[in-house]
């Protein structure tokens, strides 16, 4: 071990070990600092070089280390060794002052950097706030548009409700389009429901008519096996036609089209029959309800008439009872006079 600059440096020479390590465990010195005069092992030499980059480290040699001691007097070496610690102290003070100045200079730079960072952060925050506001406004606009669309859809549904339209159509079908009366009669010639005025002053004058019950029973009793028979006949004719080798492809196509047209006509007739049955059944239900309502109304009229008659009889009986009561009051008075 060896002490650094000052009086201690003059008194003790280098012992060839690291001055930074513990005295008991100090390894051999490998480098020496020309400014400080301390000896270091390789590890502490690297640390010293990083801490003081302006210091010059040289390889430690025992004979060279003796030149640093005050006893080495050859060629003014002792004077240089005495002056070296003083110069080293001045160099350390200068470096410390420069470090303080550099720290002071770095503080404004750091402050300016922090100010710039704060300004950048404030700008970023303001931009984020603007984006959030725009997003919130866009969401509100979307919500308003969705609400308006929903309201428009509800209004459209209420205005164009298919069930309401179907019910209106059914009610309109139950009335005669020419006279506005209930459809209570069936025209056999036109296969159509009519009202009671159509055969009198309408287009069905002189046509064969029937009641709804008669028309319903007649249509229902008709044989509905025409479609089945037509399909069986179609299959048989197709088999027979396809087995004929003289029939060409074009002839076969034409034959199939003609046969299917016949089947389609049978299907249309069956469809029309089913629709007539539904219309007649609905008209019968309407007529039945109308009859029930008419019966209820006539019953109510009879009840009202009976109530009026009962009230009239009650009034008459009250009027006839008043003179009798007056006569009874006069009779006791006459007996007193007698």
Swiss-Prot record:
Zn-finger segments (B box-type): 171-212
UniProt KW Phosphoprotein keyword: no
Coiled-coil regions, chain positions: 109-153, 257-322
Superkingdom, taxonomy of origin: Eukaryota
GO biological process terms, semicolon-separated: innate immune response; protein stabilization; regulation of gene expression
One Pfam family, short name: zf-B_box
SUPFAM superfamilies: B-box zinc-binding domain
TM spans (from-to): none
Protein name per the record: Tripartite motif-containing protein 44
Gene name for this UniProt entry: TRIM44
Cellular component GO terms held in the UniProt record: cytoplasm
Region feature (Disordered): 1-25, 72-162, 307-338
